[in-house]
Amino acid sequence: MSRTNISALSPMQKLARNPAVIAMTLALALAGCANKKNMPNSAGELGLGGAGSATPGSQQDFTVNVGDRIFFDTDSTSIRADAQQTLQRQAQWLSRYPNYAITVEGHADERGTREYNLALGARRAAATRDFLASQGVPASRMKTISYGKEKPVAVCDDISCWSQNRRAVTVLGGAGM
């Protein structure tokens, strides 16, 4: 291994070999990264997680401020009270933004056969669609699909995972605003 003659190095190369300069550069870089998520973006909104970060009428607005999913009890298609509130907010939002069409996805937990869970997911999606229709959302703007147990959001052999997978998700489509 050959040693480099320090006097032959440029001033930049000499600085790059100085441990204090390296540590200071690293500290400044990390400090800049730590504050980035709190900086306003070009639209004048707060960054991720900040109040007002969702553009009104956007998918993010729908998901964050309204809620895009509801949950079901085991082997049930009944719309629970907490789910009714979410679906009422969805109906109001969809009334405000009439150019969106939606797809209601029905899901089930991993227990049971594939066929049973596809049918259960279809019934959950239909129950969700029917509730939204009862709140004034035109049927022509809605379609349903069942994924059964094929698209879990949580995978484990535990009731906490199963309860997250028993859901209906409202997905926006169409032209939007």
From Swiss-Prot:
For the keyword Transmembrane helix, the answer is: no
Chief localisation class: membrane
- GO CC entries: cell outer membrane
- Which InterPro entries does the entry link to? Bact_OuterMem_StrucFunc, OMP_bac, OmpA-like, OMPA-like_CS, OmpA-like_sf, Pal, Pal_lipo_C
Q: Which Pfam families match?
A: OmpA (PF00691)
- Give the signal peptide as a residue range, or say none if absent: 1-32
Localization in the cell = Cell outer membrane
Specify the protein's topology with respect to the membrane: Lipid-anchor
**Lipidated residues (N-palmitoyl cysteine):** 33
Keyword Membrane belongs to the record: yes
Please list the GO biological process terms of this entry.
Answer: cell division
Lipid addition (S-diacylglycerol cysteine) is recorded at: 33
Could you tell me the keywords of this UniProt record? Answer: Cell cycle, Cell division, Cell outer membrane, Lipoprotein, Membrane, Palmitate, Signal
Domain (OmpA-like): residue spans on this chain? 59-176
Subunit structure, per the record? The Tol-Pal system is composed of five core proteins: the inner membrane proteins TolA, TolQ and TolR, the periplasmic protein TolB and the outer membrane protein Pal. They form a network linking the inner and outer membranes and the peptidoglycan layer.
What does the UniProt function comment say about this protein? Part of the Tol-Pal system, which plays a role in outer membrane invagination during cell division and is important for maintaining outer membrane integrity.
Q: Which family does it belong to?
A: Belongs to the Pal lipoprotein family.
What is the name of this protein?
Peptidoglycan-associated lipoprotein
Q: Which organism's genome codes for this protein?
A: Agrobacterium fabrum (strain C58 / ATCC 33970)
The lineage, from the top, is:
Bacteria, Pseudomonadati, Pseudomonadota, Alphaproteobacteria, Hyphomicrobiales
Query: What is the gene name?
Result: pal
